[in-house]
């Protein structure tokens, strides 16, 4: 299956209610927009979310495609924290690298920790965690979607 849905999403910590602190009401509109975005995406039932983050791994003149088994991160604000852990779609990540190469784009698979298993886990930045907080675990699904993280070249 190809691309079934595409969107741009904000990534300010205050849109997650637990991290909003005194800004809960001020970010209500943005939070509501993210909830609507998640609902719209869920209607298309993607099995994997490909997320391009401006705040993750920074590679000079190279696109990075995360090939770890997992990605996880913790975000702290106003004395509180949230944590997320997702399984990565390694097969799709390899396909993206292959297609990029065929298109003469420089893309590398990047791993962290171990080559496989629970310790094969890329640290998750806030530009990934915050959108996935809303998009990655729709209310009606029993399991989280898989993800592929892509980092732009610098």
Where do the language-model regions lie?
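A short aromatic-anchored loop/beta-hairpin motif
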Residues: 1-99, 103-108
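Internal, conserved structured core segments that host functional sites
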Residues: 94-154
